[in-house]
């Protein structure tokens, strides 16, 4: 190799007159090749990771798009825990464990093919021996790992989901489990779920760690066998024997890491099959694209000037049971309407239909003669303010909580909404006022103040209609009375629809809709319904309302 004459025909422009210069040239060439190779591999790693991250981004974005834009009835089929699990966890595991490992597998297969291919050109026997070694190694490893990784694939997704559910159950219900003194029960459930999942993780880690040692043993055996073969073939030429043996050693030790990575990739691909299957099923069930996307920035509205009419509204979550049956009533501008009934009467479902979250199976809703449909309901929503039973408080400032969902925040409108909700005096005591941050779980706001914050959020957009869905059910009597008085004040400029099962909230309404088993029993004032219906009068007595 160091003979200058060997290179004279290939690089005549370089004068090589001794072995030292030749050695330096070879050294520089090898250095350049390795530097170039490593720069190229670094670039490939960057491209590969970017490709995988973009893929994860696209998949999670598709899921989020579906959960946000799809019809509300469709998204109700997936629980909140499963939605978080699909977006936050399963996508990363599936893409990293399957796609990323698949790319690593392909890269290392190419490396092995190139090494063996180059060997075949000049050294067919060592190349054949190397190919045989690779084939035998992969066969033996797959024979050992295939069934074992199949077991991982069948159980890993299930165990991981149980583990995540146990975490969520403990964290979300911390207050209740402390009151029940059930800390040990829930902790034991968590540790059991974690133990099962960690056992699977241990096996996966073990299977990932075994291949290097397994391949190293096979290399030693292969080298001993090759030494015997090459010695017999090149008995008359020691230099040829050394060269052939050196080439095989170099090839095997270069191929060995690639074989390790290939086997690790195969193990990870096999163990994440269930995650890939689940994400494919979820992706297919999403029916992406089968929904309309409306631009809220256009601020298109249906102006409410006179009357909203509900005609023969029927709805069911499944064909077996009808939740709403022929619901018909009118809402005049300026009305303070209460919808009353026991749990299961269909009150909240009716609110969801009024807001367009759920489409009625039959019947129609008219706003000043304009029929609402899925194509124009978004215009009607722009004049609606909605106050839920449980407010979602964000870990942001008060003004960001009030103006939630708006790109640009108007401080004057925030203050106006807070004053209308009778909360501004409380917030003004904070150091930074409406710019003060609310920390979830330790914000110091009472339940009544949180509900006022929800009302301020609903009032921020200056809606013409306010819908309260069981908004006072979690409040004590005094706070409920204060909010009811506040609603009386607001009702002078808004149309209010209040849904409740507590009569004290609705006594101030000018019209009450009494519901039972998905039907409207009657519509009238508080006194009229109390006089006509013993069931209603019994509710009055139970509520201790005089």
Placement of each model-derived feature along the sequence:
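Transmembrane helices of ABC transporter permease
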Residues: 103-155, 225-240
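Transmembrane helix-loop-helix hairpins at lipid-water interfaces of multipass membrane proteins
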Residues: 1-36, 120-132, 236-242
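ABC-family ATPase nucleotide-binding domain "signature/switch" substructure
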Residues: 382-385, 390, 401, 417-420, ...
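Conserved "ABC signature" C-loop
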Residues: 388-437, 535-538, 544
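Juxtamembrane loop-to-helix connectors within ABC transporter transmembrane domains
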Residues: 68-114, 172, 196, 209
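Loop segments that connect adjacent transmembrane helices in multi-pass transporters
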Residues: 76-82, 155-203, 271, 276-279, ...
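Cytosolic ends of transmembrane helices, especially the final helix of ABC transmembrane type-1 domains
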Residues: 178-182, 206-209, 254-284
């Amino acid at each position: 190799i160091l003979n200058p004459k060997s290179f004279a025909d290939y690089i005549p422009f370089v004068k090589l007159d001794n072995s030292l210069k030749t050695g330096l040239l070879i050294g520089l060439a090898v250095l350049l090749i390795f530097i170039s190779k490593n720069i190229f591999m670094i670039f490939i790693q960057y491209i590969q990771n970017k490709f995988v991250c973009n893929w994860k981004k696209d998949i999670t974005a598709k899921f989020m798009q579906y959960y946000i834009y799809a019809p509300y009835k469709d998204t109700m089929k997936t629980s909140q825990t499963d939605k978080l699990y699909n977006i936050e966890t399963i996508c990363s595991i599936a893409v990293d464990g399957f796609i990323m490992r698949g790319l690593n597998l392909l890269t290392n297969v190419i490396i092995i093919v190139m090494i063996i291919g180059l060997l075949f050109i000049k050294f067919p026997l060592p190349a054949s021996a190397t190919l045989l070694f690779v084939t035998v190694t992969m066969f033996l490893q797959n024979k050992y790992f295939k069934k074992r990784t199949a077991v991982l694939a069948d159980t890993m997704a299930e165990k991981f989901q149980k583990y995540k559910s146990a975490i969520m159950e403990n964290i979300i219900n911390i207050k209740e489990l402390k009151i029940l003194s059930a800390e040990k029960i829930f902790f034991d459930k968590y540790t059991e779920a974690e133990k099962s999942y960690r056992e699977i993780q241990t096996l996966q880690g073990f299977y990932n760690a075994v291949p290097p040692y397994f391949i190293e043993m096979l290399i030693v055996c292969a080298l001993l066998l090759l030494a015997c073969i090459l010695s017999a073939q090149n008995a008359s030429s020691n230099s040829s024997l050394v060269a052939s043996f050196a080439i095989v050693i170099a090839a095997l030790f270069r191929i060995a890491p690639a074989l390790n990575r290939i086997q690790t990739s195969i193990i990870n691909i096999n163990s994440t099959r269930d995650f890939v299957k689940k994400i494919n099923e979820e992706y297919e069930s999403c029916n992406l694209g089968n929904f309309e996307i409306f631009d809220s920035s256009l601020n298109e509205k249906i102006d409410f000037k006179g009357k909203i009419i509900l005609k023969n509204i029927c709805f069911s979550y499944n064909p077996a049971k009808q939740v709403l049956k022929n619901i018909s009533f009118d809402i005049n501008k300026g009305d303070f309407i209460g919808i009353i009934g026991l749990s299961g009467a269909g009150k909240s479902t009716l609110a969801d239909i009024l807001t367009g979250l759920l489409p009625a199976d039959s019947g129609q809703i008219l706003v000043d003669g304009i029929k609402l449909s899925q194509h124009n309901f978004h215009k009607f929503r722009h004049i609606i303010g909605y106050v839920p039973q449980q407010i979602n408080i964000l870990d942001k400032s008060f003004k960001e909580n009030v103006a939630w969902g708006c790109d640009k925040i108007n401080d004057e409108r925030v203050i106006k909404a807070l004053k209308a909700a009778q909360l501004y005096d409380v917030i003004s005591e904070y150091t930074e006022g409406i710019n003060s941050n609310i920390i979830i779980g330790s914000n110091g706001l009472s339940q009544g103040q949180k509900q006022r914050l929800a009302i301020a959020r609903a009032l921020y957009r200056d809606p013409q209609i306010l819908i309260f869905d069981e908004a006072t059910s979690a409040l004590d009597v005094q706070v409920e009375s204060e909010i009811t008085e506040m609603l009386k004040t607001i009702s002078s400029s808004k149309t209010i629809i209040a849904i409740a099962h507590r009569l004290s909230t609705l006594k101030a309404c000018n019209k009450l809709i009494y519901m039972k088993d998905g039907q409207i029993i009657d519509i009238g004032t508080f006194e009229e319904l109390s006089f006509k219906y013993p069931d209603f009068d019994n509710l009055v007595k139970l509520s201790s309302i005089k």
